[in-house]
């Protein structure tokens, strides 16, 4: 019996896709946040730099060198009562052209009473015709806190490249005290370059970003608003239901990163990961 060529090609494609997962939890012990259980698999790894305070820092490393179509990665982090953890990445994540299936990235963050999670990865860079589906699920206790930021760059702007076509689906869900308090799905596909050029979407920007701050209120928004005149790009701020959100767009990654850092400085006493400062 001869193998079906299409089926054989699909099997080869699947066998060559990258897989990676990191799962761990942290607990407060003797006044310090310490790593507890840890699981790593595939090409995703995590490193724990020397702590600068009583919190814990974790840095994710993708040894595959980037994300391609059909790759699947997962991150799960749970913070125990009173613990504090800052999560970042060793480098900007590159998502390459995907002729077939989209890449998939699942992120699950859980914080118990009094815990704090800061999710501060470096930017995600989408190459032309990249395809990725990302899902971020957050479950906070009523007294837990969160600082979450994401930057997406459409093309290698430092090299003068722009993303013309592709697919980007970004699904966020936030639960607080067992209730769903925020749900959003962003979907850009097809002629992404043309859509980003639309004044009602990104007005020609090549980089977008979002910062979600829990708890957050109007006073925090006013503190951030005072720094707006120095921004290199554009930003919008709002606060409702006990949390605050800032949205950004800029012509390049460096400008958006600078604006994001200004907001993070207003929003949290947690120091930025050292790699953000390089």
From Swiss-Prot:
One of its GO terms (molecular function) is nickel cation binding. Pfam families: UreD. GO terms for cellular component: cytoplasm. InterPro entries: UreD. It comes from the Bacteria. It is found in: Cytoplasm. The keyword Chaperone applies. Keywords: Chaperone, Cytoplasm, Nickel insertion. Required for maturation of urease via the functional incorporation of the urease nickel metallocenter. PANTHER family: UREASE ACCESSORY PROTEIN D. Belongs to the UreD family. UreD, UreF and UreG form a complex that acts as a GTP-hydrolysis-dependent molecular chaperone, activating the urease apoprotein by helping to assemble the nickel containing metallocenter of UreC. The UreE protein probably delivers the nickel. This is Urease accessory protein UreD 3. The gene is ureD3.
